């Protein structure tokens, strides 16, 4: 039930940010590629969601634990060294392991899609400044 609530909340945030209006900026209606912004954003969201779902297991954060000789194992080692011998609860490594072990693909995909959309908006705002 909690995963469904988190997933719905992330979908709400994603839709809220997609429909936001930027105050103080004028958009040119004479743009030659009008309408392509949606498809460009959708592409970033699909790539971000796909990478997030496939990325955690590829880094070594699996359902069976942290895979040996992986990036996740190195992160865990560095985290333990920096924190005096133990990995802190609620830290980056613990959070990623929790998502890799028990997080549903839907939640991870939503987070990745949100990150993809944020990347799109950042790159789009840089193009507007030029």
Curated annotation (Swiss-Prot):
Subcellular localization, as worded in the UniProt entry: Endoplasmic reticulum membrane; Mitochondrion inner membrane
Induction conditions: Up-regulated by type-I interferon. Up-regulated upon Dengue virus type 2/DENV2 infection (at protein level).
Pfam families documented for this protein: Ifi-6-16 (PF06140)
Residue intervals passing through the bilayer: 4-24, 41-61, 75-95, 99-119
Topological type in the membrane: Multi-pass membrane protein
Gene Ontology cellular component list: endoplasmic reticulum membrane; mitochondrial inner membrane; mitochondrial membrane; mitochondrial outer membrane; mitochondrion; plasma membrane
GO molecular function annotations of the record: molecular adaptor activity
Processing and modification events after translation: Glycosylated.
Entry's Gene Ontology BP terms: apoptotic process; cellular response to virus; defense response to virus; immune response; innate immune response; intrinsic apoptotic signaling pathway; negative regulation of apoptotic process; negative regulation of extrinsic apoptotic signaling pathway in absence of ligand
Keywords, alphabetical: Antiviral defense, Apoptosis, Endoplasmic reticulum, Immunity, Innate immunity, Membrane, Mitochondrion, Mitochondrion inner membrane, Transmembrane, Transmembrane helix
Self-association and partners: Interacts with CIB1; the interaction is direct. Interacts with the chaperone BIP/HSPA5. Interacts with RIGI.
Homology family: Belongs to the IFI6/IFI27 family.
Protein's job: Interferon-stimulated protein that plays an important role in innate immune response against a wide variety of viruses. Inhibits flavivirus replication by preventing the formation of virus-induced endoplasmic reticulum membrane invaginations, which are double-membrane vesicles that flaviviruses use for their replication. Has an antiviral activity towards hepatitis C virus/HCV by inhibiting the EGFR signaling pathway, whose activation is required for entry of the virus into cells.
Protein's UniProt name: Interferon alpha-inducible protein 6
Originating organism: Homo sapiens (Human)
Gene behind the chain: IFI6
């Amino acid at each position: 039930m909690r995963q469904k609530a988190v997933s719905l909340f992330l979908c709400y945030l994603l839709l809220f940010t997609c429909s936001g209006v930027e105050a103080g900026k004028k958009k040119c209606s004479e743009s030659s590629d009008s309408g392509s912004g949606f498809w460009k954003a959708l592409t970033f969201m699909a790539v971000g969601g796909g990478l997030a779902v496939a990325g955690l297991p590829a880094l070594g954060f699996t359902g069976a634990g942290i895979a040996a000789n992986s990036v996740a194992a190195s992160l865990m080692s560095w985290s333990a060294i920096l924190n005096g011998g133990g990995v802190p609860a609620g830290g980056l490594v613990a959070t990623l392991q929790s998502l890799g072990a028990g997080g549903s693909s839907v939640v991870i995909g939503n987070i990745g899609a949100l990150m993809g959309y944020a990347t799109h908006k950042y790159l789009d705002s840089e193009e507007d400044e030029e």
